[in-house]
From Swiss-Prot:
GO terms for cellular component: cell periphery; fungal-type vacuole; plasma membrane. This is Putative inorganic phosphate transporter C8E4.01c. GO terms for biological process: monoatomic anion transport; phosphate ion transmembrane transport. It comes from Schizosaccharomyces pombe (strain 972 / ATCC 24843) (Fission yeast). The lineage of its organism: Eukaryota, Fungi, Dikarya, Ascomycota, Taphrinomycotina. Keywords: Membrane, Phosphate transport, Phosphoprotein, Transmembrane, Transmembrane helix, Transport. Residues 1-47, 121-123, 175-193, 251-346, 417-420, 471-485, 530-572 are cytoplasmic. High-affinity transporter for external inorganic phosphate. Residues 286-296 have a biased composition (Basic and acidic residues). It comes from the Eukaryota.
Length: 572
């Protein structure tokens, strides 16, 4: 056949096991590696730690502000009930802005790093986000004592936590793409979920660190009433995040490029072009024969290639490889061209809107959990120290009982139940908990409201909080994965910002019960947009992408009956 000698094995996962081009089915079924930790191979374990520690740090940095907020109130605004002059307190607008600062930065980081990851490559980008996180953290805790105005102090924190958010945001699309491209398809969901589950440990660590620090300062705070010592507490709360950040910096900077990404770049130039233009007449005839399963021409081809188990598939594979070899990357136009088609855009719409609706409720609760605990009567004490300690203990209980277990339910069940079912049931049950809180806010006891929040956290993290991260990593092909994941996550952070800025205002205007109705509506709205998404369990987005280029619209779908179902393929 009239082809060049260079062969590119597009979409193969072989780069994670050896340097030779190995067919995907051989990698999936034939590569046997011993499993050690949590059922993972050594390579999977290293990947989990490298990306997972990043998510531990992300969660710690994002949600520690919830535990620092009461300290800011006592230290700079004279307490919760009244300010230094007896006429005010920590303004809800300023509090919301400071709480939202990292999430605002997230949007820029997710879009910027997602695009750069697709355009320049994963290696070029990965690790740079951690440099930003380290610099921003140092600047936050270096707030000079020469700043006297409480408002100026909060603006200092806001500015550098915004920069911190840029770095954290960049970690989302890059870690998701790298994990997806270096995982076996049958274990991909579990590994991505496992890495994302480190967020639970980050939130848990924030509560534990706060309790330990308050315990260390117990004598000057509780017995002597020297509350200016809280200055050291909040700086340590923020500053301890430097430990994991520095630990993963070098390994990220020296990580090699994913061959799955390198190979996928060639497909961008194929979008919208006729593959036949790259082959001669004989090649064109062979491709037609290979795409006609079951007819007489395939039988003739099988006779000519007696030494091959399936001549048609071998011919298609050969043509796909050669076609990739003669193409060149055009990453800048690939994203727009790909999502110009509704069958692709509906997936981006589903992942983005589901993430947006989830984060309105998720961050509305988590960034204001200390305020909610005080309102339901849990975090009250005889003095400031005891109030802060009870608040930290309340956050710890919610993390242990609902937050962390939810992630691990997802880890163990994501490959059994599938992504779509888990996301649907999570939206339903979390919405139900918010409905109960909304309808009976004033009637339910403190323990009852606390239990509802724990259950909501459990099913939120088991369901949509995990699957909204998994979906963009699996449903989009590698050539647009980083940008698409960044867009989805950025829209989610828009929801988080809305919740951060408006929660305190709305609770003062319409009350906590009506705010819970808003959260309930967001959860049940997520059910509708989940229906746009396919089930990605066992789905190879890169393979489907290649087959669509060769066989036209829904080429893969027509060859596999299970994708004909609305449930597996999504509505519309």
């Amino acid at each position: 056949m009239a082809f060049g000698s260079k062969i590119l094995n597009i979409g193969s996962k072989s780069d994670e096991y050896n340097d030779d081009a190995v067919p995907l089915d051989q990698v999936e079924e034939g590569a046997q590696e011993r499993r050690y930790y949590l059922g993972l191979t050594k390579r999977e374990f290293k990947l989990m730690m490298l990306a997972g520690v990043g998510f531990f740090l992300d969660s710690y940095d994002l949600f520690i502000i919830n535990l620092v907020t009461p300290i800011f109130e006592y230290l700079y605004w004279g307490g919760i009930e009244k300010g230094p002059t007896g006429k005010g307190h920590y303004p809800s607008g300023i509090r919301g802005l400071v709480n939202a600062s990292a999430n605002i930065g997230n949007i820029f980081g997710q879009l910027l790093f997602g695009f750069m990851g697709d355009f320049f490559g994963r290696k070029f980008v990965y690790g740079k986000e951690m440099v930003i996180v380290i610099i921003a953290t140092v600047l936050v805790i270096a707030m000079p004592k020469s700043i006297h105005s409480p408002l100026s102090k909060m603006m200092w924190v806001f500015c550098w936590r915004w920069l911190l958010g840029v770095g954290i945001g960049g970690d989302y699309p890059m870690s998701a793409a790298i994990t997806s491209e270096r995982s076996k398809i049958k274990r991909r969901g579990t590994l991505i979920s496992l890495i994302f589950a480190f967020q639970g440990f980050g939130t848990l660590a924030g509560a534990i660190v706060t309790i330990i620090l308050l315990g260390c300062f117990e004598h000057p705070l509780n017995r002597e009433g020297h509350y200016h010592k809280l200055e050291g507490v909040w700086r340590l709360q923020f500053g301890l995040a430097l430990v994991p950040a520095i630990g993963v910096l070098i390994p990220r900077l020296i990580m090699k490029e994913s061959k799955s990404y390198e190979n996928s770049k060639a497909l961008n130039s194929a979008e919208g072009k006729d593959p036949k233009a790259f082959f001669n007449t004989d090649d064109e005839d062979n491709m037609k024969k290979s795409s006609s399963h079951g007819d007489s021409e395939v039988v003739e081809a099988s006779d000519r290639y007696a030494n091959q188990a399936d001549a048609a598939d071998a011919e298609v594979d050969n043509i796909e490889k050669q076609f990739a070899a003669v193409t060149t990357p055009e990453n800048s136009s690939g994203f727009i061209t790909y999502f110009r088609q509704w069958r692709h855009f509906k997936h981006l719409l589903g992942t983005s809107v589901c993430w947006f609706l989830l984060d309105i409720a998720f961050y509305g609760v988590n960034l204001n959990q200390s305020v909610i605990l005080k309102n339901i009567g849990f975090s009250t004490g005889t003095n400031e120290y005891r109030t802060l300690m009870k608040n930290a203990i309340g956050n710890l209980i919610i993390a242990v009982a609902g937050y962390v277990p939810g992630y691990w339910f997802n880890v163990f069940l994501v490959e059994i139940l599938g992504r779509k079912w888990i996301q649907l049931q999570g939206f339903v049950i979390t919405g139900l908990m918010f409905a109960i809180l909304a309808g009976r806010w004033n009637e339910i006891s403190t323990g009852g409201r606390f239990a509802c929040f724990v259950i909501a956290q459990l099913f939120s993290n088991f369901g949509p909080n995990s699957t909204t991260f998994i979906y963009p990593a699996e449903v989009f092909p590698a050539r647009v994965r980083g940008t698409a994941h960044g867009v989805s996550a950025a829209l989610g952070k828009c929801g988080a910002i809305l919740a951060s800025l408006l929660f305190n205002f709305l609770t003062g205007v319409i009350g906590y019960g009506n705010v819970m109705w808003i959260f309930c509506g967001c959860m049940w709205g997520g059910i509708l947009f989940t229906l746009l998404l396919p089930e990605t369990k066992g789905r190879d987005a890169d393979e489907i992408d290649r087959l669509e280029l060769f066989y036209g619209k829904d080429g893969k779908v027509q060859c596999d009956s299970k994708w004909k179902s609305w449930y597996f393929n999504g509505i519309f």
